[in-house]
């Protein structure tokens, strides 16, 4: 599965801690992330992560394009509630995930449910509906 990681500044440390906790599960999948989030997670976990531009420089749009091309299977975007309303990136990523039926977590509680589902194989339907070449 292809997993995208994104986090607002005040949630980056939470994303790092989440990825440390679930490194064993994440290691079996391909991960991409916006630049700073991905660098922090890679440094803390040793996981190989494809880095896109920072969100402010267009990284959100790069991940959004991969969602639109059905190249992302799961999105973890830890949102700061104080930034949520003004964040066009959150709204666009959430809209694309809804449009293309991509599981999306905007907080750690939902991310834990999705990551456990990933571990159990609950998301394997993505491989059937959208087979990778």
Residue ranges and their predicted role:
Residues 60-99:
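Mid-chain, well-packed structural core segment of small domains
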Residues 28-37:
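Short internal beta-strands
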Residues 109-133:
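Short, glycine-/small-residue-rich phosphate/pyrophosphate-handling segment
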Residues 53-60, 81, 110:
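Short, acidic/turn-prone active-site loops that include or flank metal/cofactor-
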Residues 30, 47-57, 126-128:
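Short hydrophobic/aromatic-enriched beta-strand-loop microsegments
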Residues 32, 94-114:
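Short, acidic/small-residue loops that bind anionic groups at enzyme active sites
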């Amino acid at each position: 599965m292809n997993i995208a990681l994104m986090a607002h500044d005040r949630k980056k440390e939470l994303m790092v801690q989440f990825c440390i906790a679930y490194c064993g599960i994440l290691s079996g999948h391909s991960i991409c992330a916006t630049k700073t989030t991905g660098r922090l997670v890679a440094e803390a976990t040793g996981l190989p992560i494809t880095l896109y531009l920072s969100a402010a420089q267009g990284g959100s749009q790069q991940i959004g394009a991969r969602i639109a091309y059905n190249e992302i299977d799961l999105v973890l975007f830890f949102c700061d509630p104080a930034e949520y309303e003004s964040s066009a990136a959150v709204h666009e990523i959430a809209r694309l995930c809804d449009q293309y039926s991509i599981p999306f977590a905007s907080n750690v509680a939902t991310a834990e449910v999705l990551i456990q589902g990933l571990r159990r194989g609950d998301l394997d339907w993505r491989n059937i509906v959208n087979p990778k070449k």
